[in-house]
């Protein structure tokens, strides 16, 4: 999974990136301190891994990961080259979802490029730049398809669809909110790689005082919640400054720190939960003496395709999957014990993998 973070300058975007990835992206109190997209890897917290690793005495434990791309702070006119220009918008065309960091805290010591705190205005500023960037993509595609539309019925149908999307965006609406009417439209939309078609997770960056009650008393957060609900987007509340402090602590210290703040989970855990929910993802597990590992797949993935996440040969030569639920395995105390109780199942190519399945794939190539 690959996420791209966007936001106006000085909303706490790079601070959040630093804390989540520990990649050390430059962060400063002035616009455009991030000149190139920073890329980091975020490990997906999963308490099942350590327990399963101990169960098998695994030499290595490998969590699932999220690739996180931090894009330079955007401003009005970014799609036309203002600020750091639209080349930075191109850097997020390949991500699975966009994490839009919005400022929901008041602090006179941290400047705002527009002089006041208004997260909805900020969101719409960024969205407009994404729309402008997508319109350029559509204009180029329209020019290409127009050349063959007179002689080609399929091209003519696509041209009509392109004009429909163009009108939608020109009305200030995001492509993801447009209802697609048939399989052709779904297929065409999938090839354009539009920024406004990508799912969005809003990270409401608040002051420490707003963390414990999840921003319930923060009018800015409530405005973003309402906006996100209308867009079928996810939102989580975070304090980038606190996350930066947490990132320097070990696991035990981190838990104590969160408890002192009245928090049950870190910002990273909130981000992962929101990402998995928005994108319809889950994890299955493989485990043995050499390695215990989590693998991220789409909900509804069948066994051969899940096997292919490990290696293409596993999918190509798939025979069957030996499956046991993670909790059942631990409760039985051994794999043999789980097998004796009939909890280890042999599943074929039509089996839909479930979250927390521990799987041993049988294959032959």
Short names for language-model regions:
Residues 1-111, 139-140:
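Conserved G1/Walker A P-loop phosphate-binding module
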Residues 40-45, 72-82, 93-155, 168-182, ...:
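Conserved Switch II/interswitch segment of TRAFAC-class P-loop GTPases
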Residues 32, 46-49, 62-68, 82-96, ...:
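Amphipathic alpha-helical transducer elements in NTP-driven molecular machines
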Residues 23-31, 38-40, 48-51, 80, ...:
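Glycine-rich, flexible loop/turn motifs
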Residues 6, 32, 37-40, 47-49, ...:
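Short capping/connector residues at structural and topological boundaries
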Residues 22, 54, 90, 94, ...:
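Short, intrinsically disordered, mixed-charge
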């Amino acid at each position: 999974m690959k996420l791209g973070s966007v936001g106006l300058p000085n909303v706490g975007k790079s601070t959040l990136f630093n804390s989540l990835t520990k990649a050390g992206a430059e962060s400063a109190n002035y616009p455009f301190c991030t000149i190139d997209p920073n890329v980091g890897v975020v490990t997906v917290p999963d308490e099942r891994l350590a327990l399963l690793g101990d169960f098998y005495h695994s030499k290595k434990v490998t969590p699932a990961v999220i690739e996180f791309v931090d894009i330079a702070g955007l401003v009005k006119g970014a799609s036309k080259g203002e600020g750091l220009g639209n080349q930075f918008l191109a850097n997020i065309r390949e991500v699975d979802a966009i994490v839009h960091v919005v400022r929901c805290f008041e602090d006179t010591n941290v400047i705002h490029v527009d002089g006041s705190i208004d997260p909805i205005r900020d969101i719409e500023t960024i969205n407009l730049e994404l729309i402008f960037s997508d319109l350029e993509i559509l204009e180029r595609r329209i020019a290409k398809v127009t050349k063959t539309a007179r002689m080609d019925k399929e091209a003519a149908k696509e041209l009509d669809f392109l004009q429909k999307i163009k009108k939608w965006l020109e009305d200030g609406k995001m492509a993801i909110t447009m209802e697609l009417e048939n399989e052709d439209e779904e297929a065409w939309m999938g090839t354009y790689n539009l920024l406004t078609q990508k799912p969005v997770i809003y990270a409401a960056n608040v002051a420490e005082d707003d963390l414990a009650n999840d921003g319930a008393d923060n009018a800015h957060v409530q405005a973003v919640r309402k906006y996100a609900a209308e867009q079928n987007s996810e939102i989580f509340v975070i304090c980038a400054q606190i996350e930066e402090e947490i990132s320097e602590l070990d696991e035990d210290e981190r838990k104590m720190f969160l408890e002192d703040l009245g928090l049950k989970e870190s910002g990273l855990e909130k981000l992962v939960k929101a990402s998995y929910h928005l994108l319809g993802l889950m994890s299955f597990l493989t485990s043995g003496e050499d390695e215990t590992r989590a693998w991220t797949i789409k909900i509804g993935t069948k066994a051969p395709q899940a096997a292919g996440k490990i290696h293409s040969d596993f999918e190509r030569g798939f025979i069957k999957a030996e499956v046991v639920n993670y909790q059942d395995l631990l409760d039985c105390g051994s794999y043999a014990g789980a097998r004796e109780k009939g909890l280890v199942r042999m599943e074929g190519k039509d089996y839909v993998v479930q979250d927390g399945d521990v799987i041993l794939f049988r294959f032959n190539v």
